[in-house]
Amino acid sequence: MLIGVIQRIDDKYESTRLIQLFMNERSTKHFLGLLAITIFLLFYQLVAPPNYFDFGALTKYIDYSAIILATIFCVLLTFSIFMIFRLIYIYNVPEKLQKHLIKRNDIPRNTRKAWFELFIAMLKQNNVDVLRDCYQELYDWTMSLREGRQWTVMEYPPELYEGIISVNEQLCMQQKEAVSIKNGNDIVNVMLDGVQFTIMHQNTYRTIWTCLNQQLFYKRSEWILKYWGAA
């Protein structure tokens, strides 16, 4: 079952990081652990040697301990199956997956990288609803990073720089659309700060120039003009 789920995630999002995240989810680990223990107990129940000792009132429970434990873990495994089905559903619905990835306040670096891969997959699929949420999350994230950093040099995390370059590359490669939230240079302009008054870091300059060079290579000169207008 899990092999099929992994294949489905790979086909839908083309993301190895999302597969790794799925396998590292608490529900997945609990399911695999309970499954292994339950299989072991069921097998042990068949080959367990008889008890020849008398433990008084506990003897009856010890005699049937393998059956009792196997029953308990079968019940736990049943609950775990429902949890893993819920997780599979989340990973198959992009809107829910996007919210699932950013639900924590302290989002790990690997999760952020996986989130950018989801962002790129939604660009390829032109899923406007999820893209709108992704743009908003990127804006909120950069705003939160700059909070309380007034008049100080603001360096963003490496995964943000890498993610913006990757998303910008995908945007440049796609066909132009008459009306689209993907038009314009919002993905680059999000690093510009005209409200919180932070000072731009050298890595931010470098990332912006990389994105502008990508746009120049793919003949998106109108985006470059929009950037200079915003800058």
Regions found by a protein language model. Give the residues of each.
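Binding/recognition "hotspot" determinant
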Residues: 17-22, 48-231
